[in-house]
Curated annotation (Swiss-Prot):
GO annotation terms (biological process): gluconeogenesis; glyceraldehyde-3-phosphate biosynthetic process; glycerol catabolic process; glycolytic process
Keywords: Cytoplasm, Gluconeogenesis, Glycolysis, Isomerase
Protein name: Triosephosphate isomerase
Residues reported in the UniProt entry to bind substrate: N13, W14, K15, G185, S223, G244, G245
Catalysis: reaction(s): D-glyceraldehyde 3-phosphate = dihydroxyacetone phosphate
E.C. no: 5.3.1.1
Domain of life from the UniProt record: Bacteria
Gene Ontology terms, MF aspect: triose-phosphate isomerase activity
GO CC, any one term: cytosol
Record NCBIfam families: tim
Subcellular location, record wording: Cytoplasm
Family note: Belongs to the triosephosphate isomerase family.
Protein backbone atom coordinates (compact mmCIF):
# COMPACT_ATOMS: atom_id res chain seq x y z
CA UNK A 1 0.00 0.00 0.00
CA UNK A 2 1.18 3.54 -0.57
CA UNK A 3 1.80 5.42 2.64
CA UNK A 4 1.07 8.96 3.70
CA UNK A 5 3.53 11.66 2.72
CA UNK A 6 3.96 12.35 6.45
CA UNK A 7 6.56 10.03 7.93
CA UNK A 8 5.24 8.82 11.32
CA UNK A 9 6.95 9.61 14.61
CA UNK A 10 6.99 7.19 17.55
CA UNK A 11 8.48 8.77 20.68
CA UNK A 12 8.87 7.08 24.05
CA UNK A 13 8.34 9.46 26.97
CA UNK A 14 10.04 7.76 29.90
CA UNK A 15 8.95 10.48 32.35
CA UNK A 16 10.72 10.09 35.74
CA UNK A 17 11.84 6.55 34.88
CA UNK A 18 13.99 4.45 35.02
CA UNK A 19 17.30 4.41 36.88
CA UNK A 20 20.22 5.13 34.56
CA UNK A 21 21.53 1.55 34.60
CA UNK A 22 18.08 0.26 33.69
CA UNK A 23 17.76 2.92 30.98
CA UNK A 24 20.98 1.73 29.36
CA UNK A 25 19.73 -1.86 29.46
CA UNK A 26 16.41 -0.78 27.93
CA UNK A 27 18.20 0.96 25.05
CA UNK A 28 20.42 -2.06 24.48
CA UNK A 29 17.36 -4.32 24.28
CA UNK A 30 15.71 -1.96 21.80
CA UNK A 31 18.87 -1.81 19.69
CA UNK A 32 18.96 -5.62 19.60
CA UNK A 33 15.41 -5.67 18.24
CA UNK A 34 16.30 -3.10 15.58
CA UNK A 35 19.32 -5.17 14.61
CA UNK A 36 17.22 -8.33 14.23
CA UNK A 37 14.50 -6.60 12.20
CA UNK A 38 15.35 -3.02 11.22
CA UNK A 39 12.74 -0.28 10.94
CA UNK A 40 13.80 2.03 8.14
CA UNK A 41 13.98 5.76 8.85
CA UNK A 42 12.07 6.38 5.64
CA UNK A 43 9.09 4.60 7.20
CA UNK A 44 9.17 5.86 10.81
CA UNK A 45 11.08 8.35 12.94
CA UNK A 46 11.82 6.94 16.40
CA UNK A 47 12.87 8.79 19.54
CA UNK A 48 13.14 8.34 23.29
CA UNK A 49 12.87 10.99 26.00
CA UNK A 50 14.89 9.97 29.07
CA UNK A 51 15.35 11.85 32.33
CA UNK A 52 17.60 14.89 32.03
CA UNK A 53 20.62 13.37 33.78
CA UNK A 54 20.60 10.47 31.31
CA UNK A 55 20.24 12.47 28.09
CA UNK A 56 23.86 12.36 26.94
CA UNK A 57 24.38 8.80 28.19
CA UNK A 58 21.38 7.54 26.25
CA UNK A 59 22.41 9.58 23.23
CA UNK A 60 25.81 7.86 23.26
CA UNK A 61 24.16 4.45 23.57
CA UNK A 62 21.82 5.19 20.67
CA UNK A 63 24.69 6.37 18.48
CA UNK A 64 25.73 2.75 18.04
CA UNK A 65 22.30 1.67 16.76
CA UNK A 66 22.05 0.64 13.12
CA UNK A 67 19.71 3.58 12.47
CA UNK A 68 19.15 7.03 13.90
CA UNK A 69 17.05 7.07 17.06
CA UNK A 70 16.49 10.59 18.32
CA UNK A 71 17.23 11.56 21.91
CA UNK A 72 14.46 13.88 23.08
CA UNK A 73 14.51 16.21 26.08
CA UNK A 74 11.39 16.07 28.25
CA UNK A 75 11.46 19.82 28.90
CA UNK A 76 13.42 23.00 28.25
CA UNK A 77 13.87 26.25 30.16
CA UNK A 78 11.79 29.34 29.48
CA UNK A 79 15.08 31.23 29.81
CA UNK A 80 17.53 31.45 26.93
CA UNK A 81 21.29 31.06 26.84
CA UNK A 82 23.15 30.81 30.14
CA UNK A 83 22.78 32.61 33.45
CA UNK A 84 21.67 32.51 37.07
CA UNK A 85 18.71 30.16 36.63
CA UNK A 86 19.26 27.36 39.14
CA UNK A 87 18.06 23.98 37.93
CA UNK A 88 17.29 25.13 34.40
CA UNK A 89 18.55 23.75 31.08
CA UNK A 90 18.22 26.12 28.14
CA UNK A 91 17.62 25.23 24.51
CA UNK A 92 21.10 26.46 23.67
CA UNK A 93 22.66 24.14 26.25
CA UNK A 94 20.65 21.21 24.91
CA UNK A 95 21.69 21.84 21.32
CA UNK A 96 25.28 22.31 22.44
CA UNK A 97 25.04 18.71 23.67
CA UNK A 98 23.54 17.68 20.30
CA UNK A 99 20.04 17.26 21.77
CA UNK A 100 17.82 18.63 19.01
CA UNK A 101 14.34 17.44 20.00
CA UNK A 102 12.18 18.44 22.96
CA UNK A 103 8.73 17.87 24.44
CA UNK A 104 6.88 21.03 25.45
CA UNK A 105 3.42 21.37 26.99
CA UNK A 106 2.94 17.88 28.42
CA UNK A 107 -0.17 17.81 30.60
CA UNK A 108 1.78 16.67 33.65
CA UNK A 109 3.92 19.79 33.44
CA UNK A 110 0.86 21.97 32.85
CA UNK A 111 -1.06 20.48 35.78
CA UNK A 112 1.64 19.65 38.33
CA UNK A 113 4.40 22.14 37.58
CA UNK A 114 2.57 25.29 36.59
CA UNK A 115 3.47 25.48 32.90
CA UNK A 116 0.86 28.04 31.84
CA UNK A 117 0.54 29.43 28.33
CA UNK A 118 3.02 32.30 28.71
CA UNK A 119 5.69 29.95 30.06
CA UNK A 120 4.99 27.51 27.25
CA UNK A 121 5.26 30.24 24.62
CA UNK A 122 8.63 31.31 26.03
CA UNK A 123 9.91 27.72 26.06
CA UNK A 124 8.64 27.15 22.54
CA UNK A 125 10.10 30.37 21.16
CA UNK A 126 13.56 29.72 22.61
CA UNK A 127 13.58 26.08 21.48
CA UNK A 128 12.53 26.92 17.93
CA UNK A 129 14.98 29.79 17.66
CA UNK A 130 17.75 27.45 18.82
CA UNK A 131 16.89 25.15 15.91
CA UNK A 132 15.19 22.41 17.93
CA UNK A 133 12.30 20.32 16.70
CA UNK A 134 9.45 20.63 19.21
CA UNK A 135 6.84 17.99 19.99
CA UNK A 136 4.11 20.24 21.36
CA UNK A 137 1.49 18.53 23.51
CA UNK A 138 -2.19 19.45 23.65
CA UNK A 139 -5.17 17.75 25.26
CA UNK A 140 -8.34 18.02 27.30
CA UNK A 141 -9.37 16.79 30.75
CA UNK A 142 -12.19 14.30 31.34
CA UNK A 143 -14.40 17.10 32.65
CA UNK A 144 -13.79 19.19 29.54
CA UNK A 145 -14.47 16.20 27.33
CA UNK A 146 -17.74 15.39 29.09
CA UNK A 147 -18.82 19.02 28.65
CA UNK A 148 -18.28 18.72 24.91
CA UNK A 149 -15.33 21.12 24.97
CA UNK A 150 -12.54 18.83 23.77
CA UNK A 151 -12.16 20.32 20.29
CA UNK A 152 -12.44 23.88 21.55
CA UNK A 153 -9.81 23.37 24.25
CA UNK A 154 -7.33 21.62 21.99
CA UNK A 155 -7.64 24.10 19.14
CA UNK A 156 -7.25 27.00 21.56
CA UNK A 157 -4.05 25.46 22.91
CA UNK A 158 -2.68 25.45 19.37
CA UNK A 159 -3.89 28.96 18.58
CA UNK A 160 -2.20 30.18 21.78
CA UNK A 161 1.25 29.37 20.39
CA UNK A 162 0.70 30.60 16.84
CA UNK A 163 2.13 34.10 17.51
CA UNK A 164 5.57 32.70 18.37
CA UNK A 165 5.87 30.21 15.49
CA UNK A 166 7.02 31.39 12.06
CA UNK A 167 5.80 29.91 8.78
CA UNK A 168 9.13 28.16 8.29
CA UNK A 169 9.08 26.78 11.85
CA UNK A 170 5.58 25.37 11.37
CA UNK A 171 6.86 23.60 8.27
CA UNK A 172 10.10 22.17 9.61
CA UNK A 173 10.21 22.22 13.43
CA UNK A 174 6.77 21.43 14.84
CA UNK A 175 5.16 18.09 15.67
CA UNK A 176 1.84 18.09 17.55
CA UNK A 177 1.01 15.39 20.11
CA UNK A 178 -2.63 15.06 21.16
CA UNK A 179 -2.81 13.53 24.63
CA UNK A 180 -6.28 13.18 26.13
CA UNK A 181 -5.44 13.82 29.78
CA UNK A 182 -8.08 11.37 30.98
CA UNK A 183 -6.30 8.54 29.13
CA UNK A 184 -2.72 9.16 30.31
CA UNK A 185 -1.49 6.40 32.59
CA UNK A 186 -5.02 5.16 33.20
CA UNK A 187 -5.11 2.32 30.71
CA UNK A 188 -8.09 4.03 29.09
CA UNK A 189 -7.81 5.14 25.51
CA UNK A 190 -10.01 6.87 23.00
CA UNK A 191 -11.40 4.56 20.37
CA UNK A 192 -9.54 4.82 17.06
CA UNK A 193 -12.64 6.51 15.65
CA UNK A 194 -12.71 9.13 18.42
CA UNK A 195 -8.97 9.70 18.18
CA UNK A 196 -9.16 10.12 14.41
CA UNK A 197 -12.09 12.54 14.74
CA UNK A 198 -10.22 14.95 17.00
CA UNK A 199 -7.01 14.56 15.01
CA UNK A 200 -8.98 15.55 11.91
CA UNK A 201 -10.20 18.67 13.73
CA UNK A 202 -6.63 19.47 14.78
CA UNK A 203 -5.53 19.06 11.15
CA UNK A 204 -8.33 21.36 10.03
CA UNK A 205 -7.33 23.96 12.62
CA UNK A 206 -3.66 23.79 11.66
CA UNK A 207 -4.54 24.30 8.00
CA UNK A 208 -6.29 27.53 8.98
CA UNK A 209 -3.19 28.71 10.85
CA UNK A 210 -0.44 27.71 8.43
CA UNK A 211 -0.06 26.47 4.84
CA UNK A 212 2.07 23.68 6.33
CA UNK A 213 -0.90 22.35 8.32
CA UNK A 214 -1.50 19.39 6.03
CA UNK A 215 2.08 18.18 6.50
CA UNK A 216 2.54 18.50 10.28
CA UNK A 217 2.80 15.12 12.01
CA UNK A 218 0.04 14.56 14.57
CA UNK A 219 0.86 12.02 17.28
CA UNK A 220 -1.62 10.29 19.55
CA UNK A 221 -0.61 10.07 23.20
CA UNK A 222 -3.32 8.31 25.18
CA UNK A 223 -2.16 4.94 26.56
CA UNK A 224 -0.80 3.61 23.28
CA UNK A 225 0.07 -0.09 23.48
CA UNK A 226 0.96 -2.82 20.98
CA UNK A 227 -2.65 -4.00 21.30
CA UNK A 228 -4.13 -0.78 19.90
CA UNK A 229 -1.22 0.53 17.81
CA UNK A 230 -2.25 -1.12 14.53
CA UNK A 231 -5.77 0.34 14.64
CA UNK A 232 -4.49 3.78 15.60
CA UNK A 233 -1.83 3.66 12.87
CA UNK A 234 -4.52 2.96 10.27
CA UNK A 235 -6.21 6.31 10.97
CA UNK A 236 -5.33 8.86 8.26
CA UNK A 237 -4.68 11.79 10.61
CA UNK A 238 -2.76 9.86 13.27
CA UNK A 239 0.87 10.09 12.20
CA UNK A 240 2.53 8.39 15.13
CA UNK A 241 2.45 8.06 18.88
CA UNK A 242 3.79 9.63 22.04
CA UNK A 243 4.17 6.50 24.15
CA UNK A 244 4.32 6.49 27.94
CA UNK A 245 4.38 3.29 29.99
CA UNK A 246 4.70 0.95 27.01
CA UNK A 247 7.98 2.63 26.01
CA UNK A 248 9.60 1.27 29.18
CA UNK A 249 9.42 -2.20 27.65
CA UNK A 250 11.68 -2.55 24.62
CA UNK A 251 9.55 -5.16 22.86
CA UNK A 252 6.32 -3.21 23.34
CA UNK A 253 7.90 0.01 22.11
CA UNK A 254 9.38 -1.77 19.10
CA UNK A 255 6.00 -3.27 18.16
CA UNK A 256 4.37 0.17 18.30
CA UNK A 257 7.05 1.66 16.04
CA UNK A 258 6.70 -1.31 13.71
CA UNK A 259 2.92 -0.80 13.49
CA UNK A 260 3.34 2.79 12.31
CA UNK A 261 6.23 1.96 9.97
CA UNK A 262 4.10 -0.65 8.22
CA UNK A 263 1.58 2.01 7.17
CA UNK A 264 4.29 3.47 4.90
CA UNK A 265 5.24 0.25 3.15
Amino acid sequence: MSGSTIIPWVVGNWKMNPKQSDAIQLVQQFKDLLKQQPISEQYCHVGVAPIAIALTTIQSELATANRQVATVAQDVSRFAGTGAYTGEISAELLTDSQIRYVLIGHSERRDLLGDHVEILKAKLSHALNAGMTVIYCVGESLEQREQGLAEQIVLQQICDIAPVVSAEQWQHQIVIAYEPIWAIGTGRTASPEDAQAIHAKIREGLCQITPAGSQIALLYGGSVKPENAVELAACPDINGALVGGASLNAESFYKIAQAFAQTQQ
